[in-house]
């Protein structure tokens, strides 16, 4: 008797299930990430949920290597992490996938700028119309910016005063002056009279800076041959030359974050000093171990643009929000956005007060607020509303809740570690 080779219905079902299992194990049954997943990743980025966004961007890029949005998203986040090599790889890929888009070009310029490769960064900024910045960066063709010519591993500079904002002595081209410390500023700002005294020659092109209240002011640019900060002697330091004295302080200039992040630095408010350390991996490990042993709060942060440090905090229990760590707010510790004003139920007086920012007069409305940054809490911190430039809350492509400043940090020694991307407060 002949045996039929036609499989039974039960056998066919078993074969079908086995095939499905094989496909499942190989991952072939998973659908490719599409527009919805990319939109979800972009939304996470806008919310400041960068680690979650990065995981989704990476998944999309793995399944669709031609995804411009995923490559750009990964490049943005690696730059926020200050992971420059990884950022460069992703941003170059994004540029290859969509050469007409400007953002990869801008962010690649930022990678090179942070790395100190100024001459290579210049064409990127020039192509974006930032002619003044490009001209300054070209001046570094045969120079190493922020070259530490001499100095110890650690140097402490006493504050001349601590309030309303810390001031230190800085020597430029052999001339000593008094400078504010302000992480809300970018490079070394030198006021007109002291610039002339120290022989700083402005380059041809000027641009405009944005200051409190959205005010703008013209800036020229220059290059300082020598700068002394405590026991550190630096050469080839980029300089911003404000075209008007500006601001309420009689100082010779401002030391901004681009100068400070050449070091692993501490603003030691209780002891009235700025501590500068060589910015090495070994120093980073040592400082973290010392800080943790001393019970310091460890607060992760992100770096946007050339000087915008962001960390998570709350206001009156609302949030969390990403706050810009800008230590240069005299007389206050917080400036909030309209969104935080409403969500934190902050009440304002009917009449504002007049103040001065880098771009001129600013009207703001004072209040007090309970704040946290990481796990650090300060109650009844003096805040202001009205001093934030329009569009500030989404200027970097993600939502910010405002600025956290001097009045919050005044009780602490605050260490900025751009290797570990963490603040240490003790």
Q: PLM features: residue spans?
A:
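Intrinsically disordered, low-complexity sequence elements enriched in Ser/Thr/Gly/Pro
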Residues: 7-8, 28
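Hydrophobic helical h-region of N-terminal Sec-dependent signal peptides
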Residues: 16-21
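Pepsin/retropepsin-fold aspartyl endopeptidases
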Residues: 29-426
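N-terminal export leaders
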Residues: 9-14
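C-terminal segment of classical bacterial N-terminal signal peptides
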Residues: 22-29
């Amino acid at each position: 008797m002949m045996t039929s080779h036609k499989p039974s219905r039960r056998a066919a079902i078993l074969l079908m299930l086995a095939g499905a299992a094989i496909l499942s194990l190989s991952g072939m049954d998973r659908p490719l990430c599409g527009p919805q997943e990319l939109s979800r990743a972009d939304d996470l980025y806008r919310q400041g949920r960068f680690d979650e966004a990065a995981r989704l961007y990476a998944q999309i890029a793995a399944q669709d290597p031609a995804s411009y949005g995923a490559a750009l998203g990964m490049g943005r986040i690696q730059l926020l992490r200050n992971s420059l090599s990884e950022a460069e790889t992703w941003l170059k890929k994004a540029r290859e996938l969509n050469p007409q888009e400007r953002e990869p070009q801008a962010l690649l310029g930022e990678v090179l700028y942070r790395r100190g490769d100024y001459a290579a960064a210049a064409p990127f900024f020039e192509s974006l119309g930032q002619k003044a910045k490009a001209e300054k960066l070209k001046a570094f063709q045969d120079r190493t910016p922020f070259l530490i010519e001499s100095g110890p591993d650690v140097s402490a500079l006493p504050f001349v005063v601590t309030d309303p904002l810390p001031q230190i002595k800085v020597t430029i081209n052999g001339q000593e002056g008094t400078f504010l410390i302000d992480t809300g500023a970018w490079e070394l700002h030198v006021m007109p009279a002291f610039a002339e005294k120290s022989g700083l020659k402005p380059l041809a092109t000027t641009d405009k800076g944005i200051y409190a209240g959205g005010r703008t002011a013209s800036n020229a640019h220059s290059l300082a041959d020598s700068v002394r900060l405590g026991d550190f002697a630096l050469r080839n330091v980029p300089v911003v030359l404000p075209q008007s004295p500006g601001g309420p302080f009689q100082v010779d200039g401002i030391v901004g974050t681009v100068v400070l992040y050449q070091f692993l630095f501490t603003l030691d408010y209780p002891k009235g000093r700025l501590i500068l350390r060589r910015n090495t991996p070994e120093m980073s490990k040592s400082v973290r171990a010392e800080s943790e042993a001393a019970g310091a709060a460890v607060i992760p942060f992100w770096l946007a643009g050339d000087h915008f440090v962001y960390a998570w905090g709350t206001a009156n229990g609302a949030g969390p929000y990403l706050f810009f760590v800008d230590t240069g707010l005299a007389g206050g510790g917080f400036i909030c956005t309209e969104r935080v004003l409403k969500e934190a139920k902050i009440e304002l007086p009917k009449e504002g007060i007049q103040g001065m920012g880098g771009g001129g007069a600013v009207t703001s409305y004072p209040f007090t607020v309970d704040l946290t940054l990481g796990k650090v809490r300060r109650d009844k911190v003096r805040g202001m509303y009205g001093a934030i430039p329009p569009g500030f809350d989404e200027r970097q492509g993600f939502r910010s809740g405002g600025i956290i400043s001097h009045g919050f940090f005044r009780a602490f020694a605050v260490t900025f570690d751009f290797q570990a991307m963490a603040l240490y407060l003790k």
